[in-house]
């Protein structure tokens, strides 16, 4: 009897599975995006997409065109590739495309309640305005010497660098730690920076692990890393709350760091930011600032190490603008175009985020076609794909910073719009969007350029180096596209 029941259940399951496969092969609605064929229900194309998103996108585009849907762990993801897809997602209307529903389940356990994607969009825009007010040129001018001081302290004691004349350094091991120190000292203030020397870095790491791909789908799973994530969030939030309360009760003059800035901010209705909101925003700000800088600086140093002649060109540019003594000033960066081109080119080849997503709220027709993207799908755009295509960039996979010398800055004459946190360029029909576009464009872009410019300038002033081995492939197992490690350079100290 039991055997018969098992046989019946297996037969039903087999019949359902055969029907599932046949349905993929035979049912094609010309008004819906084509669905990428997959053998395993629910899992769908998750493995192929997760291993190398750009290879997956190119293979699917060759079969289905620029618009197609793939199943990823139970979710229907509609990819819209190309510059038209970039514009469609980044400039989509709030009523049509929702970022909060795409990301809140991932970000809220890490950042906390009532911040980032755990709030209505109009409140998020106010939060971005508050943070942007603390990311002005006056703050950047004070940040440059702070970054240089942190780098001096770190590099002089690092086992990979130290006081020697030459050595070998593992960039994946050293740069994330160094950028935690520089980002925390500038954006967060002296108290938070001191905390990293007392174990804050371990808490940051535990919190960072909450951004694992599995948490896009199952953020509530009782995994050890998720328990560590929740514990780290509580401790870090408590630390920020104590700093805020201590500052409110002190007679200390306000400084230029972000905590002081947020403590003085008020909503349009006149109410001040709550302390737990400031704490959550500070956690988000630290992770955003450190993630982008850590990933990008590893790529920058690796790519420069593969072409040491560019390091010497940067050195000549630096000597011409700054002199041989490294007395850097923020306002000098505008006179160092090659430095800027190196950052642009690195972000073109290796943008930190490979996929940008929105929840589709109602059926959306694709311009110029009969296809309609159905409500409740997740729309996906991949600007990093267009940034590495021959249609837009000659020898697109080569690291060639000088290519930017001949390109027009699309932002200079682009239409601008204010989403509530200051003017940003509206144009998103571009092959190069490393910081996104539209209402969710990254407000930390200028900080990132200042941060990276200072770190690169310090390395160019102090060292020459070459990459050991070939330029690494990309590790897509994390949310931010880091190189596959180890990534080692052989360095020599300049005389």
Curated annotation (Swiss-Prot):
Heme binds at residue 442. Keywords: Endoplasmic reticulum, Heme, Iron, Lipid biosynthesis, Lipid metabolism, Membrane, Metal-binding, Monooxygenase, Oxidoreductase, Steroid biosynthesis, Steroid metabolism, Sterol biosynthesis, Sterol metabolism, Stress response, Transmembrane, Transmembrane helix. Pathway: Steroid biosynthesis; zymosterol biosynthesis; zymosterol from lanosterol: step 1/6; Steroid metabolism; ergosterol biosynthesis. CDD domains: CYP51-like. It is found in: Endoplasmic reticulum; Membrane. Its main location: endoplasmic reticulum. It is a single-pass membrane protein. It is an enzyme of class 1 (oxidoreductase). Belongs to the cytochrome P450 family. Sterol 14alpha-demethylase that plays a critical role in the third module of ergosterol biosynthesis pathway, being ergosterol the major sterol component in fungal membranes that participates in a variety of functions. The third module or late pathway involves the ergosterol synthesis itself through consecutive reactions that mainly occur in the endoplasmic reticulum (ER) membrane. In filamentous fungi, during the initial step of this module, lanosterol (lanosta-8,24-dien-3beta-ol) can be metabolized to eburicol. This is Lanosterol 14-alpha demethylase erg11.
């Amino acid at each position: 009897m039991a055997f018969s029941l098992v046989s019946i259940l297996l037969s039903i399951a087999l019949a359902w599975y055969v029907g599932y496969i046949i349905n993929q092969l035979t049912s094609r609605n010309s008004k819906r995006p084509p669905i990428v064929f997959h053998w395993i229900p629910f899992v769908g194309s998750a493995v192929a997409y997760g291993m190398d998103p750009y290879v997956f996108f190119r293979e699917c585009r060759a079969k289905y065109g620029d618009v197609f849907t793939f199943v990823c762990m139970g979710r229907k993801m509609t990819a819209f590739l190309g510059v038209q897809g970039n514009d469609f997602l980044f400039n989509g209307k709030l009523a049509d495309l929702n970022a909060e529903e795409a990301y809140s389940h991932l970000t809220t356990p890490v950042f906390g309640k009532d911040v980032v994607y755990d709030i209505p969009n109009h409140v998020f825009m106010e939060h971005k305005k508050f943070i942007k007010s603390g990311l002005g040129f006056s703050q950047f001018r004070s940040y440059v010497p702070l970054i240089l001081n942190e780098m001096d302290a770190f590099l002089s004691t690092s086992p990979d660098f130290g006081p020697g004349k030459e050595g070998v350094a593992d960039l994946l091991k050293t740069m994330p730690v160094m950028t935690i120190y520089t980002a925390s000292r500038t954006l967060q203030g002296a108290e938070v920076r001191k905390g990293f020397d007392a174990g804050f870095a371990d808490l940051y790491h535990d919190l960072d692990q909450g951004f694992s791909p599995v948490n896009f789908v199952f953020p509530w799973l009782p995994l050890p890393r998720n328990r560590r994530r929740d514990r780290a969030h509580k401790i870090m939030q408590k630390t920020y709350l104590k700093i805020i309360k201590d500052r409110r009760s002190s007679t200390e003059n306000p400084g230029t760091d972000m905590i002081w800035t947020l403590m003085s901010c008020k909503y349009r209705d006149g109410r001040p930011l709550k302390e737990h909101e400031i704490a959550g925003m500070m956690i988000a700000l630290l992770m955003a600032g450190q993630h982008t800088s850590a990933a990008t600086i590893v790529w920058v140093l690796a790519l420069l190490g593969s072409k040491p002649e560019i390091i010497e060109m940067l050195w000549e540019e630096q000597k011409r603008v700054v002199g041989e003594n490294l007395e850097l000033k923020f306002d000098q960066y505008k006179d160092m175009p090659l430095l800027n081109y190196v950052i642009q080119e690195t972000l073109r080849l290796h943008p930190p985020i490979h996929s940008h997503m929105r929840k589709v709220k109602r059926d959306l027709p694709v311009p110029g076609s009969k296809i309609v993207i159905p409500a409740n799908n997740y729309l996906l755009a991949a600007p990093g794909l267009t940034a590495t295509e021959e249609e837009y960039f000659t020898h697109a996979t080569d690291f060639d910073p000088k290519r930017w010398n001949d390109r027009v800055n699309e932002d200079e004459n682009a239409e601008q719009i204010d989403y509530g946190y200051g003017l940003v360029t509206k144009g998103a029909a571009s092959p190069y969007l490393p910081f996104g576009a539209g209402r969710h464009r990254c407000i930390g872009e200028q900080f990132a350029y200042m941060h990276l410019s200072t770190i690169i300038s310090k390395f160019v002033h102090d060292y020459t180096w070459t990459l050991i081995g070939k330029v690494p492939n990309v590790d897509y197992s994390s949310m931010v596209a880091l190189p596959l490690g180890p990534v080692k350079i052989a360095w020599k100290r300049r005389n």
